[in-house]
Amino acid sequence: GLYYQSPFYKELRQQQIDEKGNHVTVLNKDIKSQRALHFILGADYTFKAADRNFKLSAELYYKKLDPINPYTVDNVKIRYYGDNCAKGYAMGMDVKFFGEFVPGTDSWISFSLMKSEQTIGETTKAPLPNSPSYNVSLFFQDYFPGYKRVKLNLKGVVAGGLPQTIPGQGYEAGYFRTPAYKRVDIGLSYQLAGGNDAIMDKGLFRHLKNIWIGADVFNLFGIKNVSSYYWITDAYNVQYAVPNYLTGRQFNARLIVDF
């Protein structure tokens, strides 16, 4: 596939230094659409084991990117170079194993590898923003032994860190990656009504399929994942990166009604 992304206003903004040494912003009217040439190969394999359904999916991809208008990310602020001064690529693989590890429930595990690189100018090489080098995720469900009204689910993810740069400077000044992202969630659900329950034939319940209540613990182990950095400059003009952390452990209650 061939994809073109038309530039929008932020991509036209270019930082320059005037004759007085001041930083000014001008609009680069010569910006071109960024282009991506995709090569993707995928396959699915469906099979049965122990009278249960399973599916294995795999995908390989290579994406040639040019001309790139590079950008840096500072917390939630995105700043483009304002120039088509780079070219690059992204390539990798995704594998997902999906199936009924426990009869009547859906669970999966996935694994991804990715390598991305952009060459800015002719010499500076750096990864693309928002590009972790790996990701491992799983989602597992099980019933309480002998009582299918109680369901347990477990979610987990481990992903590589994202590239970071010094605010106000591009990749030419260097970059580093945040620590790996790690998180585990656990949840418990109870079916209040559904299926062949007598109440499902009465009143408004006739229009419903299932009613579940549940409780979750997000970020079960209270892991401090870094979302971005707050930069501090001391009296000697040395900058220090102070991490900003994502939300820690949280508790959640839910009600699910299936129509």
Task: Describe each PLM feature range.
Residues 9-16, 22-23, 68-76, 114, ...:
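Outer-membrane beta-barrel translocator domains and adjoining extracellular loop/strand segments
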